[in-house]
């Protein structure tokens, strides 16, 4: 609110997993908040996240112990998911959350975006749709290369991740069943 006091924004877009543990505060201080939750396979996104964190740490450290990065951030991600799921269980209004799979967003982004707007009682103008289509065409996945990483780089495996994400993975399976194509692309 401080950042926008002179020029109020129509809409804020906050895109980081760190917001997952602070959903009640977002609702309290921003009132008409709406959460768009893009769901990813945790065994795919957590190693990507660990790689990103490791590269960021290299900027400020002579040595980065990737096993330590993994131990901290896998637990932290599990904690954030748990906090978000607990909040969601108490505040499950359809107007508060829209669930979209990351794969659907990548494979059919226009349909996913149209669903996000529809859940808000809005629609995409033909002009905005054209902007999205142009952006998709000009920026295909992998345009700037591929980010490569493996769980083994961090001294962990899928079973280690699942210790901290079981509840979320079950939630995701239920969503896939309930929402069909929005989560299965």
Residue ranges of model-derived segments:
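Alpha/beta-hydrolase fold catalytic core
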Residues: 1-25
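PAPS-dependent sulfotransferases, especially Golgi type II membrane carbohydrate sulfotransferases
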Residues: 3-12, 49-185
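Conserved phosphate-donor/acceptor-positioning beta-strand/loop module used by diverse small-molecule
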Residues: 15, 26-51
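Active-site-proximal structural scaffolding
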Residues: 16-19, 31, 38, 77, ...
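Flexible loop/turn segments at secondary-structure boundaries
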Residues: 19-24, 43-46, 106-109
